[in-house]
Amino acid sequence: GSLPFSDRAARKVFYTGENQRPDFDETHFAFSFDYSDDSRNYRLPLWMLHLNWFDVPHNEDRDQSYLHSLGDFLDKKIDIDKIRETKKEFCTFISSVAKGRRVDFVPKLHNRYKPIACAGGLFNNIRGKLNGRGDQRWKIEFLNLFKFNISFEHTRHSGYVTEKIIHPMFSNTIPIYWGSRRVEEDFNPKSFINGNKYPNDEELIDVIAKIDSDEDLYISMLNEPWFNNNEIPEHAKPENVMKFFKEKVLA
């Protein structure tokens, strides 16, 4: 919103799920994507909101975001036979926004290697779109069918890591990521394909093709924990978020 800012008024806290910077001339504190030395800012990337940290029961009447329990995310179990049985399709892409590197990359991978199932508004080729907003339960169920998902952000900033990388993880689908160059501080680089590392689309496509065609390499990547050392990043721990609230916002 746009409530008038005043140092004498109640504490104003900025939060965004978009790639925007907090303006501390307009707010007292911020939960943002930013890595910052400013003590008024806490890095709270959007992917954090898509884990069920407290085992809240699922509400079938809502297309809610927190569908996957933290316990299941950490206790990653790979059933190779089930993977072979269910993941018979190569790759999917789900987006309706024609913005960023993905606009060029998706057609290249589709035309130069293998067809991609596009289930959003952009490049749609499945004769329909996913139910709901296409970014929660229906999306995750759809992802179960695929080995890979193109998980490109629509824009890039050092800390801007959204739900795009974590949704395929919920389905044991390998993300093909592009966006934040610091994404490996949030997630284990051995568990996904980091498109930021490759200077051009051709090299990235070669890497994808290699993993897709080598089952041992593919399974090895699937067996990696999603988090580095299978440990929750410090900034993502609920107790540290609450500590910021208590010691900064509520002080």
Describe the predicted segments one by one.
Residues 1-8, 13, 24-118, 122-154, ...:
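Pol beta-like nucleotidyltransferase catalytic core
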